[in-house]
Structure formats: structure tokens, C-alpha cells
Amino acid sequence: AQIGREMVLHTSHRYNWVQLAGAVNHPEKGKRIDLSSDNDKLADIDDSSVILYPTDGYGNPDLLKGIIEVEKPDAIFLITDPRYFQWVFQMENQIRKNIPIAYLNIWDSMPAPMYNKEFYESCDALFGISKQTKSINEIVLGDKADSKVIKYVPHGLNNKIFRPLDKTNEELQKFKKHLSRGKDCDFMLLFNSRNIRRKSISDTILAWKLFLDELTPEKREKCTLVLHTEPISDHGTDLGAVIEYFFPENDGNVVISADKFTTEQMNMMYNCADGVILISSAEGWGLALTESLLTGTPFIANVTGGMQDQMRFEDEDGNWINFDKDIPSNHRGTYTKHGKWVLPTFPTNLSLVGSPVTPYIYDDRCSFEDAALRIQEMYEMGDKERCERGKAGMEWALSDEAGFTSEKMSNRIIEGLDELFNTWVPREKFEFLKDTDYQSRVLKHKIIY
């Protein structure tokens, strides 16, 4: 939702938008809501057109057909997991005769998902949020990639909201006291994400314990791990029970923050932290790292998915790495030189897991022992070095190379859509297929790299 909002806001000077606004049970389902005047104020323009069609779930074919008939869009733009839009892809032979389909997509981990082939083939433009995803689109499509617009469009956030603050600011100091539950804190490490299994929160807690066990009681007392997440989740675990088990006399060393914060408060939270930690497995992007970068906060992260983009690993020529079928990911540590703002942990285990709809994907987990060493390294840096490293990360995130801001992300979207409109050829009304045309869904890249 955050990315979609920023994209619409920063492209509404160029395109009119009609959005299927989904929710589990949307209270305004069936309405047509005009947000143009509100968007004009936020975007500082006077001619935008932003229309919402609230709906339950992700929409349905009848609703989309009605919107196409009434609003007459020039393209359809999709964002999210392809399985939520199977019903759109099943209509592609009707839609693409008249208008193209663009898809801002991401895939969390290797191997390249050949089971997504039909989804990718149903699109005219594929904007990969991570470098790994762009490579996956090309690997899965094979020769058919030549007929698509395929671009790298990393996530970007509003750098007027997520920005460094004066650490001596009285309001910020009060907020830090709130986060630490009134405790004096010399070192605060922040986790900010959902309580789901692949976020490895329990491993983070265990790494924190190993780190604290090496400190004197006096130093330990002034260290706090803030977990900004749900305390209990069926998709994750009971964090209170985990904390009680490893910290039976918890004196504020681990704090769960379940408050709902405004974006300004979220920015303050990152500015309170000395570092951010996110050691997820199979992480598509990791917005917590983007927020960390824009606030000038160094981070500890697992080398996986889109998180490795935000670490700026370099190849042999000093260039920001790209991926292909020979080196489809850096989670094996092929490249080790990275930006100074990150302390990476490399996966120590790549386990092939899956489900009926996603038969194979790597669960690439780092060890909590490695994470503990990275925490200790960040702690021993001291405030000055952490600030210098965080500043370097912020400057890179704002640069044209990275461009992890709303404006630069939106400019990349505009470039991609303009290319699509200039090159798009409508789908043939019909095509002949032979029963021998089926291609087996087989491995197309190296396993060891």
C-alpha cells in the first residue's frame, strides 16, 4: 500500500489513475471514490485524476470488465504476488488485444520459478523490484523476454518523511524513552517487520542473547532490542514466550513495541535506533532496510532476495552487481565487498522447500551465531563510526545509482511505461498451438555459483 500510494502520488502529473482498492471486507465496496483534489494538494498539481473502486479481496473479472468499459484505461498495472491476480492472467487473451498489462513484480528467492512462466508471459512489461527478480523474469521467459519491456525498478520511499533527525531533539529523546520503556539506553537495536516465520525473529532474539552474554552487567543493562511487531501471530510465534525462555529476568533488554505509529513516528523510531537488524530468509525486498538507509541508520541483514541490492555488493570491476543464469544470487557469498553501512550475514543453509502452488524455493537462513557477531561488531563501532556509516548509506540511497526514493522510483516507472506505450503491439486475436508445443519446466541456471 505504501509503495502504491507513493507511485500514484509521484506519477499523477503524467498519468491518470483508476485503482481497485482491495480489503478483506471493504466497508465502501461498490462505490466510486474520487481522490483527485486530495491528490492535487499532496502532489502540488491541479489536474490529477485519481479514482478508487473499493472491493473485497483483489477484485474479480466482472468488476474489471466494468471498469475497463467505463474508465477506458490505456494499460493495466499490477502489483503483488501473481497468485492474487490469477483471474487477471486468465483474462489476458481478452485484455491484451486492446490494452497492455504491466506488472511491478518481485520473487523472494531462487531457484527461478518456472511455475510462474504463464504469469510472466501474460504481461507486456515486467518491472523487477529486485535485481534478482529482473534476472528471474529473463531466465523464466527465455526467448520470449525479447518481446517484453523488462526493467529494474527498486522500491523507493518518501525521503521527506524518512530522513535523519537531530539526535539531541527533546521530542526524539522522549520517544526513545517510550521505546525503551523508560530505560537509559546506550545501544538500541531495532527490528521492524511482521511476526512471520521467515523473518527469523526468534533467531534475532537468540543472537541478541549471545551478544549480551559477552557484556558486563553494567553494559548489558544499557542495551535494548526493540521488536516493533505483533507479539503473537499464527504465522509466526509467541514472542513473549521466546523472550521469557531466554530472558527469565528480563530487565528491559528486549522490548516488544506493538503500537501503531504514524509515518513521522516511524521516522523517529529509526532515528532512535543505533542499528537495524533483519535476518529474514527469502526476503523479497525488505522495506525496513530502505527506511534504515534513508534515516542514516546502519543495518545488519541476511544476504537474500532484494536485501542484497540494498547492501551494494561489487563485482570484480567495482560495479554494483547484476545477476544472470551463471550467478543468479549472491546468497552463496560469490561477492563479499559491500557498502560500509551494512554488516551482512550470509546464509549458512539453503534448504529447498515448497508447497503445491510454489513447488520449490530456497529457504536461505543465516546462523544466529553469525548474527550475534555482527551485533557485537556494530556495538563496538561506537556512535561516531555508526553515524558515518549510516550517512554513507543515506547518500547512496539518494543517489541516481540506487534511487531508493519515491521520486526516483516513479521516474523509473514512467520511463518503463513510456517505452511500453511506444513499443506495444496488441495480442493476436487467436493463435494456433500444437500438443507438442509444451516445454518442460526445467532448471535453466546454475545451482552452485
Please provide the spans of the model-predicted regions:
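Conserved donor-binding/catalytic core segment of Leloir-type glycosyltransferases
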Residues: 181-199, 205-208, 225-226
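Aromatic "clamp/platform" in nucleotide-sugar-dependent glycosyltransferases that forms part
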Residues: 281
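Extended catalytic core of nucleotide-activated donor transferases of GT-like folds
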Residues: 34-125, 131-132
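Carbohydrate-associated surface elements
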Residues: 23, 132, 156
